[in-house]
């Protein structure tokens, strides 16, 4: 019902806010994976190269996904 959707929306917004405010994290491995992160200073999804491990949630495989999650 409505109550469940409200709670679900609240938690999604909390997760979304936390992920999108995390700093870009390349990671400690030496891979070379093109990714996008949300830059909270510019308000835009920006490309970066991810090393393959040790990243965080602000790491999206596509620009479209970054924009959808972070509303950029």
Swiss-Prot record:
Pfam families: Kunitz_BPTI. It is found in: Secreted; Nematocyst. Residues 20-70 form the BPTI/Kunitz inhibitor domain. One of its GO terms (cellular component) is nematocyst. Thermostable. Complete trypsin inhibition at all temperature ranges (25-100 degrees Celsius). GO terms for molecular function: ion channel regulator activity; serine-type endopeptidase inhibitor activity; toxin activity. Gene3D superfamilies: Pancreatic trypsin inhibitor Kunitz domain. Residues 1-14 form the signal peptide. Disulfide bonds join 20-70, 29-53, 45-66. PANTHER family: BPTI_KUNITZ INHIBITOR DOMAIN-CONTAINING PROTEIN, KUNITZ-TYPE PROTEASE INHIBITOR-RELATED. Negative results: does not show activity on the eight potassium channels tested (Kv1.1/KCNA1, Kv1.2/KCNA2, Kv1.3/KCNA3, Kv1.4/KCNA4, Kv1.5/KCNA5, Kv1.6/KCNA8, Shaker IR, and Kv11.1/KCNH2/ERG1). This is PI-stichotoxin-Hmg3d. It comes from Heteractis magnifica.
